[in-house]
Amino acid sequence: MDYVSPGHSVLLLWGGAVSGDTIQTTVGNLQTKVGEKGHVRVEHVDRLLLSNHGSSTFDVVMSGTINPPTTVHSGDVLAEVARLLKPSGRAVVCEPTVSTDNGGTLRTAAKLSSSLKLAGLVSVSEAKEVSLSQQEHDLLKQALSVDGIQVVEVSASKPSYEVGSSAQLTLSFAKKKQVEKPKLDENTAKIWSLSAVDMNDDDIDLLDPDELLDEEDLKKPDPASLKAQCGTGGDTKKRKACKNCTCGLAEELEGDQPGKTASKPATSACGNCYLGDAFRCASCPYLGMPAFKPGEKITLTDRQLKGDI
């Protein structure tokens, strides 16, 4: 009753073994609260999906608020409640729940809140326990055949907009005024642009970089002195290059060895093998291989050297 105000349109849903006198008393109390400008409609919860109520008709929808509540609201019923509510309308749902999920027909209060959110409702309140008389509690236990039942009340609101509604966006394509940058102080800029010319006064002594070099530093070194000292052991010892020689001694010693001639590049008998299969002989061992550069060494496997027959 706290969510009902004068002038509201209220839908009261009932279900289970509720007496007609109790329904009439509840409707009378609601009608008194909404006043002459408001109205109250009554519908059985099982026939809600078959009713012909228009969308966004009611300010408040109350379901299961008549004790003892035995209705377990399905997802379709909650979605229909959300459809019937006006934007920012309120739904009040009372339902029997259990403390732990046992896989039966009753669910926990947390799952009831989740179902309201899945139906499209927002601002779901915390579950509040509804006090029942001993007689109402016995009737509820007899109807559901479940122990440890706890009736809770949860309220939720419909968003302040309709599903599929649109709103015009105010976009401005006018050019924005350029903000003038503050002018820099000339004295501040000079501080960060000091040079040697600015400091050329009597208080500062500047050194000439050429005066830091001696005559020995300016002499051109002898190329012989630049060679590495590796392999120098006098006339009695044989010169030997290092393992990873980088000074050129290894190449020099290799060229000084007598009887060693430079390896000649490999050549073919006909001189056309490197051009490709179109220029090769019928018995050329390079058949089937791609063209290669003249003089390039090509290694053939044992299978290629043997004939097919």
Swiss-Prot record:
Monomer. HAMAP family: Anamorsin. This is Anamorsin homolog. A motif (Cx2C motif 1) lies at residues 270-273. Belongs to the anamorsin family. The C-terminal domain binds 2 Fe-S clusters but is otherwise mostly in an intrinsically disordered conformation. The N-terminal domain has structural similarity with S-adenosyl-L-methionine-dependent methyltransferases, but does not bind S-adenosyl-L-methionine. It is required for correct assembly of the 2 Fe-S clusters. InterPro entries: Anamorsin, Anamorsin_N_metazoan, CIAPIN1, SAM-dependent_MTases_sf. Component of the cytosolic iron-sulfur (Fe-S) protein assembly (CIA) machinery. Required for the maturation of extramitochondrial Fe-S proteins. Part of an electron transfer chain functioning in an early step of cytosolic Fe-S biogenesis, facilitating the de novo assembly of a [4Fe-4S] cluster on the cytosolic Fe-S scaffold complex. Electrons are transferred from NADPH via a FAD- and FMN-containing diflavin oxidoreductase. A motif (Cx2C motif 2) lies at residues 281-284. [2Fe-2S] cluster binds at C230, C242, C245, C247. It is found in: Cytoplasm; Mitochondrion intermembrane space. Residues 230-247 are annotated as: Fe-S binding site A. Its cofactor is [2Fe-2S] cluster; [4Fe-4S] cluster. Residues 170-218 are annotated as: Linker. PANTHER family: ANAMORSIN. GO terms for cellular component: cytoplasm; mitochondrial intermembrane space. Residues 270-284 are annotated as: Fe-S binding site B. SUPFAM superfamilies: S-adenosyl-L-methionine-dependent methyltransferases. Keywords: 2Fe-2S, 4Fe-4S, Cytoplasm, Iron, Iron-sulfur, Metal-binding, Mitochondrion. It comes from Branchiostoma floridae (Florida lancelet). Its main location: cytoplasm. One of its GO terms (molecular function) is electron transfer activity. GO terms for biological process: iron-sulfur cluster assembly.
